[in-house]
Amino acid sequence: MALLILGPLIGTAAAQSLTYPDLVRRLVDLEHLATLPQAGERTTQWSSYDRRSRIEPATGRFLDWHANADGHGVIRREGNLQVLAEMKGPGVLWRMWSASPKQGRVRIYLDDAPEPAVDLPFLGYFNREHAPFDRPALVHTAARGWNNYTPIPYQTSCKIVAEEGWGDYYHFTYTTFPEGTVVPTFRSELSAEDRSALEELDRLLQQCGPRVPQDSLGRDTFEGILGPGDGHALRRTGPAAITFLRARVEGLTRPADEEALRELVLEITWDDEARPAVWSPLGDFFGTAPGANPYRSLPCGLTEDGWFYAQWYMPFGRSAEVRLLNEGAQPRKVHLEVFTERLRRPPESYGRFHAKWHRDEFLPTEATRELDWPLLKTRGRGRYVGAMLHVWNPRGGWWGEGDEKFFVDGEPFPSTFGTGSEDYFGYAWGCPDLFQHAYHNQTRNDGNNKGHISVNRWHIAEQVPFQESFEAYLEKYFSNGRPTLYAATVYWYLAPGGHDPYAPVPLEHRVGYARAPSYKPIPGAVEGERLKILECSRGRVREQDMSGWGEDWSHDAQLWWTGAQPGDRLDLELVVERTARYRVEARFTRAPDYGIVQLFLNGAKLGHPVDLYAPAVLPFGPVSLGTNALAAGTHVLSVEMAGANPEAAPAYLFGLDYIRLTPLDSQSEDLSTDEPR
């Protein structure tokens, strides 16, 4: 397996010849990431992004820049077929992804051949029922996202067309090699040698984890206690490369680990440069935050015994200094190990590894780009190789609607334009399920996308080369004021002398910002989602997170009744603390598919029927339902589905934000009833 990782070094001359096993090795070749890209080498992506997003040629202005119908965009239609992707060679398709592949056929034509090299239902590229797309590590689902990492090379051209019914959402990520590169034309029936390469790769990817070097140039270690403000540096002279780095912090427990791993900082400086190329809170550097969240991927991870590991290939010329700092108030016992190897190329043929943690750096000022959150901005020659995103989303709701956009070498329109943040990270439909894989991971999700979320994506084969500059953005729909807050660690290689604009971030901006929103209590209100369900004649009753529709619902939630029909009834238990006469009010939700309901209290009608139709999702009320004398104890609040507004979609949904009981004393008692509108 080590031979597959290292492999025979593939030359960097423009006129190179790559076999299929050579291309397979690129999926695990971490050293190749460090080599500086050749002129003419590009990695781009075709996707189903909303084609209304475009650029105005005369002015360069972005138009409909945040259009969001991203499921079915295509290049063009040819008769009954849709052209999904079209590339000139020599190149290789590295990655396919979809949120919902279906039975409509997708055909891949290579090198101007009249017959497709592959002709399958789109689902067939992902369900592992068709060779060679049947290796579980290369072809897999992750939190409802369908991924296929089987390389498909072509010499002169690649065209992907689809019949109707192919599904929803797609990505095709590919690299174009410099002119003169020779690659084989992909065939579904692989040779024995090609099959063997794929099998070995698949086995390796299924066994991701730390590979401690057994025969290295050197091993430098530190074990000790770092007091507040202390640091320790490990220094190595070159030329050489760090190929394995691991760290452990003793005594970490949740939730204290979240702050500790942000207080500890990892810095790496190459060749005595004035500023570190690597600067990150310790935990974030290894691809997960906040806290210690075990996972295993190809370049980095955290093992169950508490060892963080990174096996990025990190070359240097004269020197490398790896420094661990404790900027917190508590002493920390830490372990740090750094392994180096001899270079197998001249130092000048490599870029230097960069990894930087930041929050809200270099936000755009153009009015048309207010949603574009900058992931990375850099200048020079190098390769973008991945990112970890930590989201603090205390109100819940779907945070990741925004697309990724990559601008390479100053291009006016992004050559990578995605379809959603979770799509970029290889999953789909905002699914909160944790997953781990060689190339992408969801290492933390506190539940239903509420609280802390941590995701990463590693561009190993499909790294993005650039000659002059690289800018990456993620659209961010939820504002900081909501609050929904992003923090990212980005990873890239950059030629010496390139521009890395990211400075160290003070401790006060790294910890303490993840604060939950406060809710002003409503006197006498009983939250609908907290009411005990006594009986439901049909359908399903559950709590629904309403934070995605604004901040107007009490505690960002409601009781939600779905699947009802006219005449159905829902009985809820209402607890009254003391005997009194009460004004009864309720706050509901109105929406295009909500019904008309009649409320009852202990079998007696409460007011008139309430029409909950509206053309948009809106809070409604509080609606006065009259006054009632109620004894202390339990009572039955009933909801009867009476029908629907003629304008409403006939789904007969019902949402209750809260019911409020206000006691009336003898001086202020008001027996009048405000009728529902």
Kindly label every feature range from the protein language model.
Residues M1-L9:
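Bacterial N-terminal signal peptides
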Residues A2, G71, R135, N147, ...:
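Amphipathic, alpha-helical segments enriched in basic
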Residues G11-A14:
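Sec/Tat signal peptide C-region and signal peptidase I cleavage site
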Residues Q16-Y519:
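Beta-strand-centric surfaces of beta-sandwich/beta-rich domains
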Residues V408, H509-S672:
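Extracytoplasmic
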Residues T673-R677:
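Short, low-complexity, charge-dense intrinsically disordered segments
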